[in-house]
Amino acid sequence: MKRFMKAWSKYLQIEEKISHFLKVKSITILEYAVALIYIWYGLLKLFGVSPVQELVIESTNWILPEGFVVVLGLWEILIGVFLCIKSLRRYGIWLFIPQVLGTFLPLITNPEDCFVKFPFVLTLEGHYIFKNLILVAAVLVIASTLYKRKAS
């Protein structure tokens, strides 16, 4: 039992060090992770190899021009680049808002592409869309860091 308690104590010390490290670095890691996702997805659209390209075209062809996917790709790359640069981060967040709202558009315009059985059984495309809720939460965390809290 004594051995276990010693090992447990050592584990807790390591866990505490990791927790302190994450307290300092986790938002930076989150910023770069979201930026990487946006740059990657944007490049896929830019080069015409995005797995959701057809869904984007189908859900926007009634309102946006044919080359919109390329513009969207550039838009997403800008979001990613701006999130990497602290002085431009707020612009990345502002660009993110209409982009992420647009990602939910197929739920309205093409529900048959998003659901096997409405409202709970999703297609692969539906999964792809709903995972954007995680990106929304991540960007909310990033946005919360734009201003330092003043001591009161």
Predicted regions located by residue number:
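Membrane-interface extramembranous regions
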Residues: 1-152
